[in-house]
Amino acid sequence: VASKSIPIQVIYLVIGVLIGLAAGYGVFSITTPSPRPGEVPTGEGRVYTIGFTLPLSGELSSIGKIWEKVVKLAIEDLNNEVKAYGLNVTFNYEILDDETKEEKALQNVQTFAQKGIKVVIGPAASAQVKVVKAFADENKIVIISPSSTAPTLALKGDFIFRTVGSDAGQAKALATLAYQEGARKVIVFHRNDEYGKAFADFFINYFKGLGGTAVSQPYQTGLADYAAEVSALAGRVQSEGFDAVVLVAFDTDGANILSHAAESAILSKVRWFISEGPHGASELLTQSIGEFAAKVRLYGTRPLFIANPLYIELNSRFKERFGLELSVFCENLYDAVKLAGWAIIRAGSYDGEAIAKALVEVAKTYYGPSGWTAFDEAGDKAMQDYGVWAIVKTAEGKYEFKDVGVYERGSIVFIEVAYE
């Protein structure tokens, strides 16, 4: 996925085109007879339910709990937007916890299918998306993941859509960041799952192409503690002379790994780089991890278009209402809700195939907090930008996540100083 910038001046024009088209199709939708399960006609119009399978517990729970709030805000905004155009349509939502587990995500999608729900947003992890794919395709249920990024799932002609670019792009950005920062011999410490393995493979290929050397060291997922795994990593770093560690993790495992790394004299002497997975998790904002981040000059990448005023506006509203900053993929989740709603309206019938086709068309002209949402031929976000983030100390002595750079035209450009 190439990193491309979108001119800010087209934002409002694009949104106007989207809403104009969607509103026109919405009038047709309201007059469509024969409601199906998941679509409820009332005296005041039609009510549609969008299903959500989110990681409210398990390895992505820190981020999942933030996402739950994003869903609430996005549904409210969608309903207000629809009503502003005079459409007698209301969207409800149902959230089920998938515990960041593959089989639980499948159970949730099956539960939604039994209720006649044709659009499900989530699951979060690529391993989960891989498991639900066959059922979704067979039953023509539209799956929109805001965060699955494994390149191995970039497949044509299925019912899986992703409002984020695949890690083929992010791995290139992270490899560029590490090399530009002086890393030459890297060990990639990664989750031994669909996401981690694919990310590591792409990173290693890109990093070698830049002139560096890199090897992978997978770790088992789902452990209560990673002390032994971090100890083994330290031993290998010392014996083989690596000058940097690249961590590809989720939030709970990532925080646990960094907490143990902070106690290692060996791992505190090499540079650290990190994927988007742990971004936004409060567990990373402890004093020990914050001090470690400064010591090793920890930088990460994440899908983000920093110069997007719609993202800034959403983050401001979210912080005012919930007292929190947006975490990784919040903007992708928000846009997934908007796309799903307008695709249902535009489809003209509550049918998975019709909604999938409408989704592609709506995304072509929708520009939201995550940027331009057009899909490529595999159903992934076609134009994905990447930002660089760090963990920095505030004036009050606390720690926070901060976006400090961008991946632009094949190189990293820092816009703020993260570490002295």
Please identify what each model-predicted range represents.
Residues 1-42, 417-420:
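Secretory targeting signatures
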Residues 13, 112-124, 144-146, 187-190, ...:
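Periplasmic-binding protein-like
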Residues 35-41, 45-47, 62-69, 81-155, ...:
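Beta-alpha junction/loop-to-helix N-cap segments that form part of ligand/metal-binding clefts
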Residues 46-49, 87-92, 115-120, 138-143, ...:
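Loop/turn elements at helix/coil->beta-strand transitions in domains of secreted/extracellular proteins
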Residues 63-81, 104, 170-173, 194-213, ...:
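Short, solvent-exposed amphipathic alpha-helices that sit
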Residues 150-152, 157-264, 304-313:
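Extracellular/periplasmic Venus flytrap/periplasmic-binding protein
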Residues 258-334, 345, 350, 411-419:
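Extracellular/periplasmic periplasmic-binding protein-like sensory domains
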Residues 318-330, 341-401:
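Segments of small-molecule ligand-sensing domains
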